[in-house]
């Protein structure tokens, strides 16, 4: 009886174990199904967000043509002097661009941020061109960026004076002549001549109240006098106009310059007769360089997504510089961050917890975006490293890395195509967008481009160029060239000092 009971107990235990094993297997299978279901749901949500992003940021060619037309309309409003024009089309008073014949010693001062550059160039005319050039970069102490006008310009003039003192035998100023300077000043000014301009407001971290409303040429001139420096400021220009001048000196077919860097702008050569707001005698050259300030362009045709609208709303200048916020290096990385944040919140892209670093505005910079976008390794190693360092996610799957790279591609492509639409608009304004009606040969047309975004973000620049070719068509695009004018604004200012020299007619 005892043996039978023991056997019975063993059978019951074995049965219980068997049931437990079966139940455990079922539970594991159910848990696995739940995990697989959750993963499938996450993938579905990720795909849905990406589909919405692709749609919101899409730029079909027909839309780009409409944007170009809207750009031309705004340019014409600006040239008429319409007070409500979004694209201001500022008259620069630069009516003579360098020809290559310029000779002599000229200086340039390039002030546009926390550093400034002083440069000198010896020009040798058509044959020798740039004989010699030297430059020096100087950091501006932070306290001078918020001090007084006199303190800032005295510091700049002192550095310029020291630079002049190092002028060697390679540089020659003809007897009895005054040194001349081109002043690149990349802040908003209201110009009344080639060598005068009133500061409208400071940007880029400067806040010097007593300089606002003052003529910056006069302020610099007085500072140079205090240093005992005998130098005439022959030209006041912004960086885009300087790039145009440098581009024209290198290639006589350059008609426009585009800056695509932290910010964006365009300048081009307009027929003076096509500027209704121009008053007084027309320039002898018949031309006038226009500083478009196209970053402020906006139109209901621009594809603004929820990410763009939120970024604009939270910016220091809501409702302003809309075009710039869509295409310039200051903002592209931030747009990518906002899209990744939505994927993290709505689709758990980085897991159940949203990375806290991803919540920080502008933590993802455009150079980091570019590095991820250009990662061609089989495991997208650079993307993984950037997500670890910037977003704080130590281990990311290949799928997450691919999605991140794809978001970079979407944002960069939209920016490049919108930039191409703007360039196409400038070409339309110049009548360089179609073959001549009389059947003559299309003139060679060169666009000088500068800025870190265009120079270093290769997928951006190649997309811009292919989009411009698409907009122009094969016949016209074969005569239109985009050319990198690396660091053209500094030497461009010196060249404009030469072309607007008080001794130009004597030479």
Swiss-Prot record:
GO terms for biological process: glucose 6-phosphate metabolic process; glucose metabolic process; glycolytic process; intracellular glucose homeostasis; response to glucose. Induction: By glucose or fructose treatment in leaves. GO terms for molecular function: ATP binding; D-glucose binding; fructokinase activity; glucokinase activity. Its main location: plastid. The chain crosses the membrane at residues 4-24. Keywords: ATP-binding, Chloroplast, Glycolysis, Kinase, Membrane, Nucleotide-binding, Plastid, Plastid outer membrane, Transferase, Transmembrane, Transmembrane helix. D-glucose binds at residues 203-204, 238-239, 265, 293, 324. GO terms for cellular component: chloroplast outer membrane; cytosol; mitochondrion. Pathway: Carbohydrate metabolism; hexose metabolism; Carbohydrate degradation; glycolysis; D-glyceraldehyde 3-phosphate and glycerone phosphate from D-glucose: step 1/4. Fructose and glucose phosphorylating enzyme. Functions as a glucose sensor for plant growth and photosynthesis. Is essential for pollen development, germination, and tube growth. Its activity is necessary for the starch utilization pathway during pollen germination and tube growth, as well as for starch biosynthesis during pollen maturation. Expressed in roots, leaves, flowers, immature seeds, endosperm and seed coat. It is found in: Plastid, Chloroplast outer membrane. Residues 44-498 form the Hexokinase domain. It holds the Pfam family Hexokinase_1. PROSITE patterns: HEXOKINASE_1 (PS00378), HEXOKINASE_2 (PS51748). It is a single-pass membrane protein. Residues 99-237 are annotated as: Hexokinase small subdomain. It is an enzyme of class 2 (transferase). It catalyses: a D-hexose + ATP = a D-hexose 6-phosphate + ADP + H(+); D-fructose + ATP = D-fructose 6-phosphate + ADP + H(+); D-glucose + ATP = D-glucose 6-phosphate + ADP + H(+). Its EC number is 2.7.1.1. Belongs to the hexokinase family. The gene is HXK5. This is Hexokinase-5. Plants over-expressing HXK5 exhibit hypersensitive plant growth retardation and enhanced repression of the photosynthetic gene RbcS in response to glucose treatment. Signal peptide: none annotated.
